């Protein structure tokens, strides 16, 4: 037997003599971004990875079944992370954190778990393996409406481009106004498309009153309950964001 060969007893001794604490401290220092932290307000944006190929058998562009699944995924994210609002369009989700920071603000933890929860939830709903990447955008309160409109504009532009190239397969992409005008000439009227396809959906918390009865006294009681709702109106979405800002400013 070679002198360099470990026996079971040798390996046992080698493992036992190692200091877990020292090794943990050593490799913790080598972790990338382990010390990075974020504070409110901030946005987590989740972008679908390879959704075009993975969802090619769905209606293109903007299958209502896919969008419905994305909205349901937002509901799960809202409940899991207790963020203020979620916005979804195309293959992306933006989570707005205005007054609560999960995982003590640890960026590494936040981006990995938000991507994991979103990927798992959407995969189950659409019965296929789907993946999101995740990034942190540090914003000021004054940036919130601008960020929302930025993602609305990006999603809107992508949708019009997809419609255009579905009709005009071999053309270069012209200016947005020209695409809309040429599509209309071909009978594709953007104004007739559903709002969720054009502008996405905002998921937000709201409070309702629920009437119940005191089991001891039999008296009627009114309790407040927080529920999730969806709006497809950009005007309404902006109003909701402004109201949330006023509560944390």
Residue spans for each PLM region:
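Regulatory and interdomain segments flanking nucleotide-handling catalytic cores
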Residues: 1-249
């Amino acid at each position: 037997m070679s002198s360099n060969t470990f026996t079971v007893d040798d390996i046992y001794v080698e493992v036992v003599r190692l200091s877990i604490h020292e090794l943990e401290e050593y490799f913790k220092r080598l972790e990338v971004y382990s010390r990075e932290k974020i504070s409110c307000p901030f946005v987590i944006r989740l972008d679908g990875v390879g959704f075009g190929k993975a969802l090619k058998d769905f209606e293109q562009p903007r299958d209502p079944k896919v969008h419905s699944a994305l909205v349901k995924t937002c509901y799960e994210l809202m409940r899991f992370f207790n963020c203020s609002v979620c916005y979804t369009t195309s293959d992306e989700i933006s989570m707005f954190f205005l007054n609560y920071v999960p995982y003590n603000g640890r960026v590494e933890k936040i981006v990995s778990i938000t991507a994991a929860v979103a990927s798992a939830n959407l995969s189950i709903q659409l019965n296929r393996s789907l993946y999101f990447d995740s990034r942190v955008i540090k914003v000021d309160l004054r940036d919130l409406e601008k960020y929302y409109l930025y993602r609305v504009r990006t999603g809107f532009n992508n949708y019009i481009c997809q419609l255009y190239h579905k009709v005009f397969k071999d053309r270069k992409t012209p200016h947005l106004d020209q695409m809309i005008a040429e599509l209309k000439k071909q009978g594709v009227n953007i104004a007739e498309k559903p709002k969720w396809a054009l502008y996405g959906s905002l998921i937000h918390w709201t409070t309702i009153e629920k009437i119940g009865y005191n089991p001891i006294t039999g008296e009627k009681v009114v309790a407040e309950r927080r529920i999730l709702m969806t709006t497809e109106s950009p005007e309404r979405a902006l109003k909701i964001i402004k109201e949330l800002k006023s509560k944390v400013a």
